[in-house]
A protein has these predicted regions:
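N-terminal alpha/beta PP-like core and its mobile active-site loop of ThDP/TPP-dependent enzymes
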Residues: 1-97
Length: 97
């Protein structure tokens, strides 16, 4: 963890402690410190996706492609505002998988 922002380091540590090893990131100005920290953290692989509507489905595909009986969680990091709402269709789809 390399950020000088304490909350970013805490978030990265929490993700790691919950077994998150893959993160789909939609870089923006507001989440840049988080994206940078995740990208620099050993053991976490970032997958950049520019479209938030697709990012949730990409994360679901990565998780479902995991051959283990209990796939590891895949996180999605988007910027603030309506970007989060663009993940809603993928969240609904993942819930019913």
């Amino acid at each position: 963890m390399y950020s000088n922002i304490d909350n970013v380091n805490i978030l990265t540590g929490v993700l790691q402690s919950h077994g998150v090893r893959r993160v789909v990131v939609c870089p923006g100005s507001r989440n840049a410190p988080i994206v940078h920290n995740l990208n620099e953290t050993e053991g976490i692989t970032c997958y950049p996706v520019t479209d938030e509507r697709s990012a949730g489905f990409v994360a679901m595909g990565i998780a479902l492609g995991d051959p283990s009986p209990c796939p590891a969680p895949v996180a999605v990091c988007v910027t603030s505002g309506s970007a989060l709402l663009n993940l809603y269709p993928a969240v609904c789809e993942a819930y019913y998988q």
